[in-house]
């Protein structure tokens, strides 16, 4: 059963994001619910991808476990039997797509890491020879592996607004804390490096990804939100990779390409056709199976 919007009247709804609904459980914990909503170009589509939220949740849990030695994360439990009673009453709606997490002070930055030149980075490079105003060598081609992994942050926009790519020095201004900014950049690159090495062993190139961070009560940096999912990353099949062109992918790129092909108005939500829904879901399933070695159980 698809879930477009969760409905938990006995829990305090804190926010509805592009994909996740966020509830306060008590003064120290939150419930993250991954719905089946899908967005592209910062626009939420009118219909959903059934089961997508469960796949995203399972992939995030997989990465939280794999990367926990690089940086702690905000997870308390994803086992529904361990959730508080007031959450368990919504089992039918929420099980398999919810995680109970510690409350954190969220850092207002999208921590984007790029190993390959594609997407908005490729667009900027063609115009200016830079990504986030960071100069790059001449002569790079689309989808080429970058000379070194780049940390290219963006602002964290409100729903309906667009994230803005910024130079890392601008992040220092926004945070007002150079030490924290440096730690975020170093942690994001370390997380990406470990994840991309693992994914490569499974035949997947992680071209780029987006991390989000929070601070705990002792000001320790913590990994939060979703991690290395097909919503937040570009996953390419390694056996089909060829620099100089757009790549096949196991992620939202299929949807982005469809929307571009119909000259999508990036200010207006639309209803997606069934074949686009099915193709998008199959790509998410394939990413899950390749990364985890498990079958999807929707």
Feature names for model-found ranges:
Residues 29, 106-108, 203-206, 218-221:
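Coil-to-beta-strand transition motifs
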Residues 113, 206-227:
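Conserved metal-phosphate-binding beta-hairpin within the catalytic cores
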Residues 41, 122-123, 218, 232-234:
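Intrinsically disordered, low-complexity acidic/polar segments
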């Amino acid at each position: 059963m698809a879930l477009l919007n969760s409905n938990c009247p006995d829990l305090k709804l804190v926010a509805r994001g592009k994909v996740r609904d966020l509830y306060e459980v008590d003064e120290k914990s939150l419930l993250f619910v991954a719905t089946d909503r899908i967005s592209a170009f910062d626009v939420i589509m009118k219909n959903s991808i059934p089961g997508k939220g469960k796949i995203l949740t399972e992939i995030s849990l997989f990465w939280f476990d794999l990367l926990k030695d690089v940086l702690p994360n905000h997870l308390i439990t994803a086992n529904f039997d361990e959730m508080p009673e007031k959450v368990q009453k919504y089992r039918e709606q929420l099980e398999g797509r919810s995680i109970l997490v510690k409350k954190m002070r969220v850092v207002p930055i999208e921590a984007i890491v790029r190993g390959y030149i594609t997407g908005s980075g490729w667009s900027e490079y063609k115009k200016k020879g830079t990504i986030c105003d960071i100069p790059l060598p001449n002569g790079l081609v689309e989808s080429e592996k970058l000379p070194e992994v780049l940390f290219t942050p963006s602002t964290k926009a409100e729903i309906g607004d667009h994230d803005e790519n910024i130079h890392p020095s601008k992040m220092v201004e926004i945070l007002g804390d150079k030490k924290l900014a440096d730690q975020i950049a170093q942690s994001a690159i370390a997380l990406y490096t470990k994840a991309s090495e693992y994914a490569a062993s499974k035949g997947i190139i992680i071209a780029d990804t987006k991390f989000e961070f929070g601070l705990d009560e002792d000001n320790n940096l913590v990994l939060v939100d979703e991690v290395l999912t097909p919503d937040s990353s570009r996953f390419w099949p390694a056996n089909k990779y060829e620099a100089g062109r757009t790549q096949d992918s196991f992620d939202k790129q299929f949807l982005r390409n469809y929307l571009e092909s119909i000259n999508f108005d990036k200010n207006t939500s639309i209803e997606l056709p069934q074949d686009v829904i099915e193709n998008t879901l199959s790509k998410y399933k394939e990413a899950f199976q390749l990364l985890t070695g498990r079958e999807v159980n929707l």
